[in-house]
Amino acid sequence: MLCCMRRTKQVEKNEDGDQKIDQDGNKPEDKAHKAATKIQASFRGHIIRKKMKDDKKDDNSEEAVENHKGEAKDEAATTENKTPKTEEPTADGPLEVKKEAISSPAEDKKQEPSSEKPKDTPSEENQASAESESTTKGSTENSPGVDASQAKEESKKADVPEATQDAASEKEQEKAESSQEDVKKDEVEEIKASESAQQDEAVSEEAKPDQENA
């Protein structure tokens, strides 16, 4: 019995040793596999995070564009809402005109009885109309004279510079003529002097042979 127990114990010890060896042999591979899986997982997570960030940026840009478009639409709507407000006074204009038209007949009716009571008012109105006609006639009669006087003054003003220009041109012509006359006089005097000198030379030459003959 003891021999059997010893043998069985030895067999169990050997089995435990084999299991330990198997566990030790599998551990490095398992570690390498786990490390590789961790690296792959971290790399995938990094890539996924980048994609998520890019998607968020795109979403933000699209949201910004949409917000800008919405703001532009809101501004256009506000401007459209503002423009009718400016036109509201013009819409009220006809109502005010109607009110004035309604009030004016009442005022005319009030004024008619007062005009019927005094009998001397038509004569005063006739006098006023006659005075106004006379004033208008006088103004119309005086206006042509005023226009004629203004036209004469303007023509005089227009003639004054022309006269000054004519006087200046005449003076220039006189100066030019006087200078030409002076030049002509100088030329005549020079010609006379040259002729007299030639005559003197001729007389002196004629006198020389006479002296020699004498």
Swiss-Prot record:
Membrane topology: Peripheral membrane protein
Primary localization class, coarse: membrane
A molecular-function term among this protein's GO annotations: calmodulin binding
Localization per Swiss-Prot or TrEMBL: Cell membrane; Cell projection, Growth cone membrane; Synapse; Cell projection, Filopodium membrane
Pfam families: IQ (PF00612), Neuromodulin (PF06614), Neuromodulin_N (PF10580)
Lipidation (S-palmitoyl cysteine): 3-4
InterPro entries: IQ_motif_EF-hand-BS (IPR000048), Neuromodulin (IPR001422), Neuromodulin_C (IPR017454), Neuromodulin_gap-junction_N (IPR018947), Neuromodulin_P_site (IPR033137), Neuromodulin_palmitoyl_site (IPR018243)
GO biological process: cell differentiation; nervous system development; regulation of growth
Name used for this protein in its record: Neuromodulin
Organism placement in taxonomy: Eukaryota, Metazoa, Chordata, Craniata, Vertebrata
